[in-house]
Design a protein with these regions (language model features):
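An extended, acidic
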Residues: 1-118
Length: 118
């Protein structure tokens, strides 16, 4: 796995609370950030390895249903801000922390959860 400091992240800053979004923008643990605005496509790009990290603060079922399944089938890792089991997170408004690589995923999940609390 590449170090998180050289990772490409897909982060939807406008779906994060203001303080956390400011922290992600000002002190990113990754090298570069993108956002395309199409959640299913972004999750598929993560599954394909185009993005190393993925973060979204709240998706609706039509946003995440197909893309999260494709990422999971590709061997990717997903969880929510509060729940380790992504599939039992609240269905109507689901946060997503994801990565294809399990080592990067663990680092990213821990960073997100720690920094959301500040």
């Amino acid at each position: 796995a590449p170090p998180m400091s050289s990772a490409m992240a897909n982060v939807d800053l406008k779906r994060l609370d203001r303080a956390f979004a400011a922290r992600v923008a000002a002190y990113p643990p990754f090298a570069s950030q993108r956002n395309f605005g199409a959640c299913a496509l972004e999750l598929c790009y993560t599954a394909a390895g185009y993005f190393d990290l993925y973060l979204h603060g709240g998706q609706k079922p039509w946003d995440y249903a197909a893309g999260s399944l494709i990422l999971a089938e590709a061997g990717g890792n997903l969880c929510g801000f509060e729940h380790d089991d992504y599939w039992t997170s609240p269905a109507w408004h689901r946060s997503v922390i994801a990565a294809l690589d399990p080592v990067l995923f663990a680092q990213w999940r821990d960073w997100v959860r720690e920094n959301r609390k500040k």
